């Protein structure tokens, strides 16, 4: 998709930052997006792939990501199968939500933070079971192999061969990056922040990562994915609410400084290059 609003009309570059036009800001500010778990680490500058500026552009709706159809389809089909697998293995009853039915947000009382966790534990009455000391679920799918991607309009897209299969760059290369030298899985700070925000908003502290390592064919034929035939690691985590509140406060200040004003974070050199790639300079 790329930029969907008009440069020099809806927004402009002023003093090394993008400023929304007064007309666009007043007309659209009520529709600006909240900070979700996915965006949380990005606005804090923790993502190596997306700057806080790009996240800002998405949140004020002048830019839309161009999603990789192969990855999106695989995720939509495979993640429910992983959730079922986790329920079977743990005996928990993790529930997922229809995004449209909850209007893409379970935290409507918070004006800054929102989103939907991958799974929440329910009791036998269908009520949230956090009082039973059960964790929240976060699902991550990752390729075993390092695959070849190409940057198109500032977004990475998986490259397929003539048979429609992902092209392997290095066998087990992606999987190896998840482990330290002692063979222990390392959860990135970005992913920790993602589930951490939802735990914080629910006022609970236990989470459970389900990390599934996919093979190339899983991206092409996700309907045939069988969780029992893939390596899926379950990693429990905890957050410290007092420590995590420092990050929440930083993100809230970021929201107030940039979303509520219609003025972006200052542009970095990589942001300027990204704008040029999208025809804005």
Swiss-Prot record:
Pfam families hit by this protein: YqaJ (PF09588)
Source taxon at top rank: Bacteria
Secretion signal span: none
Protein name: Uncharacterized protein MG373
Species annotation: Mycoplasma genitalium (strain ATCC 33530 / DSM 19775 / NCTC 10195 / G37) (Mycoplasmoides genitalium)
Taxonomic lineage of the native organism: Bacteria, Bacillati, Mycoplasmatota, Mycoplasmoidales, Mycoplasmoidaceae
């Amino acid at each position: 998709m790329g930029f969907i609003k008009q440069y020099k009309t809806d927004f402009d570059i002023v003093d090394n930052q993008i400023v929304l036009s007064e007309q666009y800001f007043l007309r659209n500010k009520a529709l600006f997006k909240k900070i979700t778990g996915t965006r949380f680490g990005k606005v804090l500058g923790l993502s190596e792939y997306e700057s806080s500026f790009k996240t800002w552009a998405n949140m004020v709706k002048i830019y839309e990501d161009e999603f990789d159809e192969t990855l999106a389809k695989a995720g939509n089909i495979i993640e429910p199968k992983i959730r079922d697998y986790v329920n079977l293995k743990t005996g928990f009853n993790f529930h997922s939500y229809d995004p449209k039915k909850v209007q893409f947000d379970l935290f409507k009382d918070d004006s800054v933070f929102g989103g939907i966790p991958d799974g929440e534990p329910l009791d036998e009455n269908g009520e949230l079971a956090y009082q039973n000391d059960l964790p929240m679920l976060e699902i991550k799918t990752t390729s075993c192999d390092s695959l070849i991607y190409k940057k198109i309009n500032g977004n990475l897209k998986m490259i397929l061969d003539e048979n429609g299969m992902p092209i392997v760059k290095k066998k087990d290369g992606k999987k190896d990056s998840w482990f330290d030298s002692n063979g222990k899985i390392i959860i990135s700070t970005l992913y920790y922040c993602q589930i951490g925000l939802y735990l914080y908003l629910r006022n609970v502290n236990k989470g459970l990562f389900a990390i599934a390592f996919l093979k190339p064919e899983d991206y092409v034929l996700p309907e045939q994915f069988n969780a029992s035939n893939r390596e899926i690691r379950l990693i429990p985590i905890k957050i410290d609410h007092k420590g995590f509140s420092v990050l929440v406060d930083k993100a809230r200040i970021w929201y107030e400084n940039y979303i509520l004003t219609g003025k972006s974070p200052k542009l970095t050199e990589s942001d300027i290059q990204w704008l040029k790639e999208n025809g804005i300079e």
